[in-house]
């Protein structure tokens, strides 16, 4: 859980910007999106292997 306290003489926009930055740094939003819907274990394995295959192909390319 990210917590941001508005500082003295700080605009709300600046505080919101700091909050968004802290949320993106600690991965709260990504974790929420990942857990938003249930994924069967078989689907998780399939996505994981596809991602590994994609990374492997990406590393193998040479320009």
UniProtKB/Swiss-Prot annotation:
Residues 53-63 have a biased composition (Basic residues). Signal peptide: none annotated. Residues 40-52 have a biased composition (Basic and acidic residues). The keyword Transport does not apply. One of its GO terms (cellular component) is ribosome. Residues 40-63 are annotated as: Disordered. Keywords: Ribonucleoprotein, Ribosomal protein. GO terms for molecular function: structural constituent of ribosome. It holds the Pfam family Ribosomal_S21. One of its GO terms (biological process) is translation. NCBIfam families: S21p. Belongs to the bacterial ribosomal protein bS21 family. This is Small ribosomal subunit protein bS21. It comes from Limosilactobacillus reuteri (strain DSM 20016) (Lactobacillus reuteri).
